Amino acid sequence: MKGGLVPLGKKKKEVTIEIIGGNAEGVTGSCTRIDFYGRTILFELGMVQDNSTILGNYKDNCAILNRIKPKKIEMVILGHNHCDHIGLVPMLFARGNTDVKIITPKDTTCILREMWSDTAFINERDTEALNRKGDKCYTPLYTQAEVEMALKNVIEIEVGSIIDIDENVAIRYTPAGHILRSCQTELYINGGSHTRKILFTSDLSNRMIEDRKVFVEKFQPVTSANIVIGESTYGKRKGSMKKKDIELDRQKMKTVIEQFCIDNKHRVLIPTFSLDRMPFIIWELYQLFGKDESFTVPVLIDSPLANRLLDCYSSILDGETKDKFNEMMSWKNIHRIITPEDSKAAISDKGAKIICASSGMLCAGRSVKWIQSILPNENDCCLFVGYAGIDTLAGKIKHGTGQKTININGKPYKNKCCLVDLHSYSSHMQHDDLVKYYKSINCEKVYLVHGDEQARIELKEDLEKALGDCCKSTRVVIVNKGTKISL
């Protein structure tokens, strides 16, 4: 990529950036449009998952596609493979754009296939449910046919080197440490005599637990850019975890399992996301109990998607990391539940067991069936290990401890099981580390996205103070819907 980085305002402003997805003011539906020299590309195209209704999410996701004019998109650059960052990409093909290039870090196509295929299945099921309820006919956002079309256009590129995509665009992926193969993206836009560099952080590693996430590459910092478009998920000062919280939560998990599964011979449900969180929790359980020959409690992995993704991990990992993964998956206590019949049989068996089932927010998947069995039983426990939106079923259960019943799919269930909520398993960078990292980058502006309003306000205040203390003139900007950035 020819040309040196040019300071903002010194050349004709030919590059325009607009955060048009849900990440402008929230934490799902990440999508950024970059217009330059008559061309349009996207950084990520994720699904909105904030709405409490199927129809609400459907409309929100259609609205994103309507804003970007799908047939004009030449390229989508992906940072990592969580659905809220990649889930709408096949919808471009459903809207008639069959030529769009999809750029992704090396070794991630297997994960993309599973995530998109699962989403297509859910899309079709949800639209069938909507069509049964009303007179209007809804079509799926996309189907498996569009998934297959999208996969043919995926281009994997190496991590760590600047790769020329075409005469105007180059990319360097740098490990973000958030999940397996997740990357920050340094996007170079070449204008001939000069080059502009934009750093998209996507989601960043929780530095406090990265030594325990043995299947994920370690975070590496980027040192410079013209501008940074950075996440702020945990930008709030209050609630940012400390090292001691992590070990306390780990011991709490151990105590809960010993009490409910070993002493009382009952069940512990751990609702968890299929990608990244599932192998992390299985590894934690293996570290806690795997060497104890007297520990005979079955550990069920009840999620078709999670089981397929574990197979992807097996094909992607290598060296010492692959050895650790194989050791974990060879643990005699692990039982992989695949078929619906086996899942139903496991649910009907009230004996001692640990159940790791997706999804983590109890929005879909087999965890919903499990919670229907667990929730009314005061001898069982539901152990939450991740964030849950307040309007999701998991959020309603977390915040409904005083309620006698919880409605699940329109039916009331007694609210009697023990609830334990662990907060230190987040894979996102925490407030203090966000300030430290963004302060270290030599750039002209930092634009804060992917966080609620209060998180962005508090992070902006503290980052500005830290920048001032080290005599840096970097500006910090809170992005809102409609914010346009010119370079």
Residue ranges and their predicted role:
Residues G365-I371, S426-I441:
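A short, acidic, amphipathic alpha-helical segment used as a generic capping/interface helix at domain edges
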Residues N206, V216-K236, E320-F325, V385, ...:
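Metal-dependent catalytic core segments for phosphate chemistry
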Residues I34-Y37, Y188-N190, F215-F219, E284-K291, ...:
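Short, solvent-exposed amphipathic alpha-helical segments in soluble enzyme
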Residues K152-V159, H335-P340, I478:
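Short acidic-hydrophobic, aromatic-tinged amphipathic segments that line or gate anion-handling sites
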Residues A455-G482:
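Short acidic, glycine/proline-enriched helix-loop-strand junctions
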Residues I406-K436:
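Generic long, charged, amphipathic alpha-helical segments
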Residues G9-I77, H82, I86, M91-F280, ...:
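His/Asp/Glu-rich metal-coordinating catalytic cores
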Residues K252-L393, N407, V449:
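Hard-cation-handling environments
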